[in-house]
Amino acid sequence: MSDKIRTLQGRVVSDKMEKSIVVAIERFVKHPIYGKFIKRTTKLHVHDENNDSNIGDIVEISECRPISKTKSWTLVRVVEKAIL
């Protein structure tokens, strides 16, 4: 197992909680029989200490120690702000 911290990029889909956001991570998976690439989405709860992000922002997150029952990721930076 590597000691490198996992980082991912995703889109903020909810920012209604205090110091927390929900980020959707999209990935493509090849169908085992037909070979077609299918889009799969994973929603992660992320700790946002300063409430920096809004809905629609592209953010970079990294894995950390468990902060609560569902939060074990933290916000690194906002890559791109959403166009309102």
From Swiss-Prot:
Coiled-coil annotated spans: none
Disulfide bonds: none
GO molecular-function term, one example from the UniProt record: structural constituent of ribosome
SUPFAM superfamilies referenced in this protein's UniProt entry, alphabetically: Nucleic acid-binding proteins (SSF50249)
InterPro entries: NA-bd_OB-fold, Ribosomal_uS17, Ribosomal_uS17_bact/chlr, Ribosomal_uS17_CS
Pfam families assigned: Ribosomal_S17
The UniProt record lists the keyword Ribonucleoprotein: yes
GO annotation (BP), single: translation
Top-level taxon: Bacteria
Recorded family membership: Belongs to the universal ribosomal protein uS17 family.
NCBIfam families from the UniProt entry: PRK05610.1, uS17_bact
Name of the protein in its database record: Small ribosomal subunit protein uS17
Organism: Sodalis glossinidius (strain morsitans)
